[in-house]
Amino acid sequence: MAQVINTNSLSLLTQNNLNKSQSSLSSAIERLSSGLRINSAKDDAAGQAIANRFTSNIKGLTQASRNANDGISIAQTTEGALNEINNNLQRVRELSVQATNGTNSDSDLKSIQDEIQQRLEEIDRVSNQTQFNGVKVLSQDNQMKIQVGANDGETITIDLQKIDVKSLGLDGFNVNGPKEATVGDLKSSFKNVTGYDTYAAGADKYRVDINSGAVVTDAVAPDKVYVNAANGQLTTDDAENNTAVDLFKTTKSTAGTAEAKAIAGAIKGGKEGDTFDYKGVTFTIDTKTGDDGNGKVSTTINGEKVTLTVADIGIGAADVNAATLQSSKNVYTSVVNGQFTFDDKTKNESAKLSDLEANNAVKGESKITVNGAEYTANATGDKITLAGKTMFIDKTASGVSTLINEDAAAAKKSTANPLASIDSALSKVDAVRSSLGAIQNRFDSAITNLGNTVTNLNSARSRIEDADYATEVSNMSKAQILQQAGTSVLAQANQVPQNVLSLLR
């Protein structure tokens, strides 16, 4: 080998090897300090690309798992609201069963309907206000896609349905709808109700005021109607007097009258304090004189005491034919009503509905005025019409009664088959709740699968990019030894040109 000083080949060779060991040492230290086998693309270009794709998948699937948990939360929120709607529907059904019982009064039905209305309004409130992260989940039909994968199209769809009173088929649900108005309803529900009932007795027609019961003729200029005191017939003359029937007319009866004999016989057969009836009057034996029938009896008529005295029956008489009767007051019987009076003249009385019925009067239609509007009622008073249309009584939420025609009543009538309507609504709610329960289970399965996939991808990525510490420590030790050896050898290689000086001495 030539002896030269310009180029130290041994030194250059040693430096090159030292640089290689330095690079190996740096790489080993970098991997050991980072824990990664691939710290840059130069370490393993293909491996870095593969590991990066794994990282994308891992991050995407991890977020997808969180998305699936959000999906469960949405389903739980919606299902919780539906549970409360279900509770309200159950109460509405319970109230509807109560309302169908025939023992309920109008006020009972109104109270039941008031609570039903509040429950239905609460259903609408829950529907309109239930939301998840600002998204209303029951106010409209909606399909919410939940991303449960790392790539496009990997979604699970939650079907959200609009659930409110209308969508449940309970819009206008009513157990206390309007009912056909009757004359009694008008009189009890409204103020300033006037009118009359019409009656016909033979060729004559009459009106009866619905409030006072006064009877007048059904004419352009109606006259007041009276009952004739003599024969009980209807008349428009109030001045005619009629003679009453004698009961005890004279204060001094002649001997042997039927009255005297009857009362004398009662005294003879009784004792003081006994009572007996005669001509519909109850008498008391006040005084009994002997055993022949002489004595006094008394009674009270129209609040006044009347005393009858029986006398002139001889002692030991075999009968009472000779008895005389004296009355403290003249007493008569009315030919009209059979009541007792002390006057032998009775005046015609104002006719009443009972007098019309006694004269076989037949009731016709009625004319009723309510708040200035005139209505017609049929003969029985159970059907009110206006312009040919049947009228109905409707009560507002505040309990105020109003009259509406049959067209308006049809829109507010009681719900037909209310229990079937509620059962249908409950079935719809149950179907939506079942769907939400199933979707929650599906999300649970998706989350489990995503967790397994992320675990496996992490393992695969680790095998590609993570550093093997056993290998890297060996590489580092080797590089350190080579560095030490190379440094020592380089020092000796740098001394080789010194040998040329020995030739120059």
Curated annotation (Swiss-Prot):
Keywords of the record: Bacterial flagellum, Secreted
GO molecular function, one term: structural molecule activity
GO CC, one annotated term: bacterial-type flagellum
Source domain of life: Bacteria
This protein's record includes keyword Secreted: yes
Subcellular localization, as worded in the UniProt entry: Secreted; Bacterial flagellum
Keyword field contains Ribosomal protein: no
Pfam families assigned: Flagellin_C (PF00700), Flagellin_N (PF00669), FliC-like_3rd (PF22370)
Family to which this protein belongs: Belongs to the bacterial flagellin family.
Note: Individual Salmonella serotypes usually alternate between the production of 2 antigenic forms of flagella, termed phase 1 and phase 2, each specified by separate structural genes.
PANTHER family documented for this protein: FLAGELLIN
Function: Flagellin is the subunit protein which polymerizes to form the filaments of bacterial flagella.
Name the UniProt record assigns to this protein: Flagellin
Classification of source organism: Bacteria, Pseudomonadati, Pseudomonadota, Gammaproteobacteria, Enterobacterales
